[in-house]
Amino acid sequence: MKILVALAVLALVSTQLFAEDIRANDDLNYWSDWSDSDQIKEELPEPFEHLLQRIARRPKPQQFFGLMGKRDAGHGQISHKRHKTDSFVGLMGKRALNSVAYERSAMQNYERRRK
């Protein structure tokens, strides 16, 4: 029984020492590999390199449109329109704050379309 325990301890110690030797060599080479950008470009496959370039490239502030669309630098889009207080226009479309007024306007739109 003591022989089995001794063999197990010897195996664990040898694997720890072997793993430390590999880890020490990797630490030294890790930073030197990243310092040479030409070597990295040669090792990367083409689609992966293209993906990294797209991630690294940032859009200019005037290129970002977002959910509200393209913005004018001079004036806002709302300034030309008449403000209606009884309706709300969001991402899901026009919603009435007053349901009676919304139903009335829906009926008027329906009647106009029928004519």
From Swiss-Prot:
One of its GO terms (biological process) is neuropeptide signaling pathway. The keyword Cell inner membrane does not apply. One of its GO terms (cellular component) is extracellular space. Residues 20-56 form a propeptide. Keywords: Amidation, Cleavage on pair of basic residues, Neuropeptide, Neurotransmitter, Secreted, Signal. The keyword Lyase does not apply. PROSITE patterns: TACHYKININ. Residues 1-19 form the signal peptide. GO terms for molecular function: substance P receptor binding. InterPro entries: Tachy_Neuro_lke_CS, Tachykinin_dom, Tachykinin_fam. The record marks 59-60, 63-67 as: Cleavage. It comes from the Eukaryota. It is found in: Secreted. The modification Methionine amide is found at residues 68, 92. It holds the Pfam family Tachykinin. Belongs to the tachykinin family. Tachykinins are active peptides which excite neurons, evoke behavioral responses, are potent vasodilators and secretagogues, and contract (directly or indirectly) many smooth muscles. This is Protachykinin-1. The lineage of its organism: Eukaryota, Metazoa, Chordata, Craniata, Vertebrata.
